[in-house]
């Protein structure tokens, strides 16, 4: 029976030459274009997409010009007409084949496993599950891209095999500016995963909790569902192997670990010692300088995987919300289905307190 701890994680890095994503090795997440947004918008939707693209700026700026409070002032009739137009382009409530959506009530909650890979291609490797905790208000292409960057690094630098990836949006008790209701954020994450990925899932458990839930408890929840209830991965001989569960984190989450009073030492020891963390590094920065200055993170450096961002990407949810309030285009910053959802429910139109938008950090931003 394999055990998951910092020592065997550090020993999981291979001595063999690096694997290539395009190599004959089968340790590669299989991708499908079945739910690709490009395919959704071809043929019968192409003309409507073009019409919507032309229409969008005038619609976005209409409420801005008529409002003095920063919120929408478009008439109810016009908003209903806009929603009807969007509904013709894409049915956001249509659930693609094989997809299970999350419940809105905790007593109806079921752990999502419809895309969980139940076997290892290479049984000599450690099964890995990545969990991204955050606001996702809204989810952007960078949030999705972080999982892809992690996939490359894990495949090339470790002896682990990725079997699942999860988004875990925070609940409404996490008091932060610009936080849309949890059920909206969960649904936007589901739309993003359903229509752009063949392996990512959304878990609503954290968002359904009656009070703020710390990250350490969220990771315990995944360990309970995957390893304690399911036994992990079933090998070809019928035996079970527990999955390594790691936190996939960006800038605000990790940088906050170095701020006094934000995280308890007990939680940091639990997260970094029992589970581990994948940190997405900002292009041109040195994450190890930060780890060197943090006693607890340095102590668990063998259980931390640094993911370099080879193509600079600074999309943030904060900037997306700002663009929406200013009536600017957010196309190509987040999936089309998420954009349509935001417009359908008129999200992120309310003014937010003035703050620094262009945040500088050695890490990629995960929050807000």
Curated annotation (Swiss-Prot):
It catalyses: beta-nicotinamide D-ribonucleotide + ATP + H(+) = diphosphate + NAD(+); nicotinate beta-D-ribonucleotide + ATP + H(+) = deamido-NAD(+) + diphosphate. The keyword Glycosyltransferase does not apply. Pfam families: CTP_transf_like. Its cofactor is a divalent metal cation. The modification Phosphoserine is found at residues 36, 75, 85. It is found in: Cytoplasm; Nucleus. NAD(+) binds at residues 135-136, 215, 250, 252, 263, 282, 313. Its EC number is 2.7.7.1, 2.7.7.18. ATP binds at residues 143, 318-321. CDD domains: NMNAT_Eukarya. GO terms for cellular component: cytosol; nucleus. Catalyzes the formation of NAD(+) from nicotinamide mononucleotide (NMN) and ATP. Can also use the deamidated form; nicotinic acid mononucleotide (NaMN) as substrate to form deamido-NAD(+) (NaAD). Key enzyme in both de novo and salvage pathways for NAD(+) biosynthesis. NCBIfam families: nicotinate (nicotinamide) nucleotide adenylyltransferase. This is Nicotinamide/nicotinic acid mononucleotide adenylyltransferase. The lineage of its organism: Eukaryota, Fungi, Dikarya, Ascomycota, Taphrinomycotina.
